[in-house]
Amino acid sequence: MQPRALLIESFRAAVAAADPQFIVPAHLPAPPAFGGRTLVIGAGKAAASMAAAVEAHWPKQAPLEGLVITRYGHGLPLTRIRCIEAGHPIPDDRGEEATRTLLSAVQSLGPKDQLIALISGGGSSLLSLPAEGIRMQDLKAVTAQLLSCGAMIQEINVVRKHLSLIQGGRLAAACRAPILALIISDVTGDDPTHIASGPCSPDPSTYADALAILNRYAITAPTSVLRRLEAGAAGAIHETPKPGDAVFARCENRVIATPQRSLTAAAAVFSTAGVTPIILGDSIIGEAREVGKVFAGITQHIVQHHAPFKPPVALISGGECTVTVKNPQGRGGRCSTFLLSLAIELNASSGVYAIAADTDGIDGSESN
């Protein structure tokens, strides 16, 4: 098989390993007894696909209703679960309206009902309901700056949680029914609190942490945002629910797909083709252009010295690189930045082939 075709096949295998139609059904609970309701809610770039998997495998005679929010262009025609498209990675009014409707539905559940939450990457912006005193335009302004300053996604989400009525465990706190959150991870470490800003997860971060992040990256925040965070840090506003809070006794967060699962699937493709796969890890972080330079150095050493691995070899990794955006009109994202940096450093070295892509199909402002 030609190198280009092999790279594409490996990536397709990685995507298939996280395909909701294959991984969601095995995790679905039974319908509640005594006629209780099952409400499905979700947010993220995989929300529609996850909801479709639920519909396909839910008993036809059992009640099922719900609402999921996904990125523009990612919606699917569902029959029992409503699907709404909204803004990503910058939140918008449509997302706020949909989230308000979603929260109202969750609050209508009782102890005999059940909530299935479908959580995936991108949920932080799609599940947006600004806290009291915060306007959507304020949230947009802060989000845009955080996304372009080089902050890690974990840091960005700490700020988001403390400007939200639903993230950072607040969705779980608003629900009286048992909750099963099925989560597709897109973050290093696979911690549910960082995936879609953890709507059903305990939040160990604080208002003071959020303020420190804004200061660290010199974010020019609207007055309303600073006022809320400062009030929270002073104890004048309730914190997000923390680990050990009783609200999580009725909530299970279950990570059903991870970056490591996808890397393993990609590695199997190379093994079958007679290429030695080396998984470097699923937690690669740093500026994408700098990571590209490091990978170029490793690659050149292998090509020149056949060490520490003898070619043919495939270096496989995943993670959450960052990009500091200097031109707001720029295009692309971390994958294209990584590849460009890699290509420049390799300087047309022969026998080297590379692919970098996101399993969700989106690289920054562009499709893969």
Predicted feature residues:
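A glycine- and small-aliphatic-rich helix-loop capping segment at beta-alpha/alpha-beta transitions
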Residues: 53-63, 80-83, 107, 130-141, ...
